[in-house]
Structures are given as C-alpha cells and as structure tokens.
C-alpha cells in the first residue's frame, strides 16, 4: 500500500474536525524534522510526530577559540561562550492554549526603542526586561517554569555533559565549486583551458536538463547548522563563560543555542 505523506502546521491540525474522529488519532513522537509529519501505517491510521528538545537550553554568544590544558597536560581546543543579560522565560506555551508545550526564552538586553511595539508589549506582559532574541524550546514537560524566571547555565549543565550547539555559519558569499564543494581543479598547463571550471553538469538530449541538487557554484555559508554531542570542558562562574570542546558555528559575537545532547536510549526512546 502506498504511503501518503504531507507536511502541515499544527494549528491547522487542531482546527480539523477529523481529529476527533475514530479514523484520525494523533500520536506525538519525537522526530528529526521540526515540522509536523502525518503518515499512515498499518496499525494506526495517522501518526503525528514533532521535534522536541531533550531538555531546556540557553542562548549564548561566541567569544572565540583557545587551547585548554587539562591536568595531565593534554591540550584541548575549546570555544569560549559568554552570556549576556537574559536567558529569561518570557512565555509558557501549553497544549491547551497553543497546541504544543514549549518554553519561550529571551536573550540579550536592549533598549526599548530597539524593539517594535508588539515585541515590547509581549515582554511587558511577562514582566521581563526588553530583549533582542526570543526562541522556543519544545519540551515534553513544562512544569516548574514560570514567566520572568531566569535560567542559569551552571544550574542546567555541568562539566562533562554533552550538548548540541546550533548557530549560523560564517557567510562566504558566492563561491565556486572548488571552495564550495571541494572539487579537484584541472591542469594549469599543457594546453588546458579549464582550470577551475566544473566540467560536465549533465547529459545531452536525455534528460536534456540539469538535475535538481547538482553541486554548482553558489552562495556559501550563512546557513543554520547544529553540531551535536560536544563536551563541556570548563564552566567558569566568575567570568560567566563556558568552554566547549571543538569549533562552534559562526564568528565571534554569533548567537548560539545550547541544548542537552540527544542520545538514543538515554533521553530519546529507541525505535
């Protein structure tokens, strides 16, 4: 039997009268995609799955990279992440009112005139300071959170924990195939006329077109990415910074989203 798949938004699902019917029974399961996915299966008519975090996270600012020396002399490359004023709960979203459970966090204090009136009103309703960035963390349990609650990094994470860090990569602009996709260049001598050109990008009459997704020159970087299972090497309460092993997305000053690492069998159920 063919499997029908469609991506829809959650509010539209709640407005559908078919949710209450016996043929449509939604079941919420963690998935890789942040969108809601409806698919048919032999046992259940439809299964609704959405992406959720393994736990509450925080936002921080990338400061740069350095070398950290452990007690045995081992040198570990780390990225230093600092925290501006913020990481305050601005809204609690529930399944009854919003269609899903989530905690909205604000980060980086700014002046009032830097925000729009709707943004200012939203933060004033929560009783928080004006903040530039607002992000949601979808959780399976939102108990224990309240508006204007401040989240402290060392109360959520500790040294040795594994985290997932998301951010925007450094933009490189329009680049060729060699830099963007690591293609091998052509000969520079012996009469070669193609030094850094792509070469063939497809066949002739059949199919007579270039396939979608073909690796070609284009805009490089400046995209959202996530690096998973990075180790927290050091938490410095005095300097209000944390050192995370490895490189993190973006350049110094970039906004980072730090969440507990998703590990199958630990905080994610096995299939």
Swiss-Prot record:
One of its GO terms (biological process) is translation. InterPro entries: Ribosomal_uL3, Ribosomal_uL3_bac/org-type, Ribosomal_uL3_CS, Transl_B-barrel_sf. Keywords: Chloroplast, Plastid, Ribonucleoprotein, Ribosomal protein, RNA-binding, rRNA-binding, Transit peptide. It comes from the Eukaryota. GO terms for molecular function: mRNA binding; rRNA binding; structural constituent of ribosome. Disulfide bonds: none annotated. Residues 190-222 are annotated as: Disordered. SUPFAM superfamilies: Translation proteins (SSF50447). The keyword Ribosomal protein applies. PROSITE patterns: RIBOSOMAL_L3. GO terms for cellular component: chloroplast; chloroplast envelope; chloroplast stroma; cytosol; ribonucleoprotein complex; ribosome. Residues 1-49 form a transit peptide. It is found in: Plastid, Chloroplast. PANTHER family: 50S RIBOSOMAL PROTEIN L3 (PTHR11229), LARGE RIBOSOMAL SUBUNIT PROTEIN UL3C (PTHR11229:SF16). Belongs to the universal ribosomal protein uL3 family. Part of the 50S ribosomal subunit. One of the primary rRNA binding proteins, it binds directly near the 3'-end of the 23S rRNA, where it nucleates assembly of the 50S subunit. This is Large ribosomal subunit protein uL3c. The lineage of its organism: Eukaryota, Viridiplantae, Streptophyta, Embryophyta, Tracheophyta.
